[in-house]
Amino acid sequence: MSIRLRRRLIDLACRALQATLPTPLQRWGWAIRCEAAAIPDDSKALLFTLGSLCGLMPRAVASRLLTIFASPVGDHVSRPEGSTIMHIVNAATRRPRALGIVCLTSAVLLGTAYMAIAGAPMRYLGVNLGALIIGLTLLLLLERAARSGQGWTDGANLMMAGALLATALFGSQADGIARWVYWGGLAMQPSLILLPTMLVAFSRFRNVPATVSIVAAAVAMALQPDRAMAAMLVICLTALAVMRPDRHVCTALAASAASFAATLIRADRLPAVPYVDQILYSSFDLHAVAGLAVLGGLMLLVVPSVIGWRRAAESRAIYVAFGAVWFAAILAAALGNYPTPVVGYGGSAIIGYALSLLALPKFSSANALATAPKCGAIDDMPTDGPLSVALA
């Protein structure tokens, strides 16, 4: 990475920190900028700036989240000192989708911090940030489609399954494995974009067309073959079968288990790709700040699921599916040469995460904030009702 680029990243990080910090902490932002400017070694200055960013950003984000999530009534209620985190958790349960957007954005930024430290090409950072913009734009557009009441869920689910099958049959191949399509010179992995969305949606909206879509997706994973995505199917559907078994889940689980078994027959010999695979380990070898950025970003991916599980009794199946999907993606990246979702280079998982947020409730019951949870009691939190958007 050139000296000029390092200094630009330092300036960008300082500007982002100053824009995020609340007024009482603004002096810390200026102090970090001045200290970084006084460090002659550009690499050390960049590491100092990113370390300071990781140290101060949680407090800044906590302050902003409290403002974003707090209800108009809650803003006028006195809050006891030292309860900021608890208020954020309580308020976030009212807007699970917004919480997911915050987690996704934070994870992408942590991933770009890792790539900057690792010396990745500037284009890689731009690809991930561009994918974030595309994903959030699609999320906004599909939310509007949901409000318009278009009932095209079943047809679009079948179209997504068809896209996965088409990738297996006609996609770009490497060592006999067909998982990718090229768009604008960039390799995209449709399974990372579509499969998480299909699985989280299936947890809410189960019928024959949805089951056929999942079975077709399982066939596609066996044909590609893609062991990581087949494992995602098995892990998610097993969790749903334990939570709320029915004939649709059992049928889809049987097909997914057969798909995963088929992927085990053939060895997956694809080598690790820099900035994409195995970065959970290599980042710590590079620098502790880089490793913590990767680890923190991955942990953020399951935060909506953890909070939803604890606070939303009636929506638990949705949050279990969401958490199982992204836990499976993280597990695959940790165990083999598979893409590290969101924090590694590649836009497919970023777009896929954004789309999977559509299956989470946009708003939850305000009663969840009225009182703190009591021992043995579970807050009531209704779901949004039947899903009316195919990608949701």
Which residues fall in each region the model found?
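A membrane-periplasm/extracellular boundary helix in multi-pass inner-membrane enzymes
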Residues: 248-273
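Helix-loop-helix junctions and helix-breaking kinks within/between transmembrane helices
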Residues: 216-240, 264-271, 284, 288, ...
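Alpha-helical transmembrane segments of multi-pass inner-membrane proteins
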Residues: 158-171, 190-225, 232-243, 252-258, ...
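A juxtamembrane structural motif centered on a specific transmembrane helix
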Residues: 355-392
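Negatively charged linear elements and acidic catalytic determinants
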Residues: 1-86
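Membrane-helix boundary/helix-loop-helix interface segments in multi-pass membrane proteins
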Residues: 103, 113-213, 218-224, 327, ...
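N-terminal membrane topogenic signal
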Residues: 3, 84-104, 152-153
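Hydrophobic alpha-helical transmembrane segments
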Residues: 128-138, 288-306
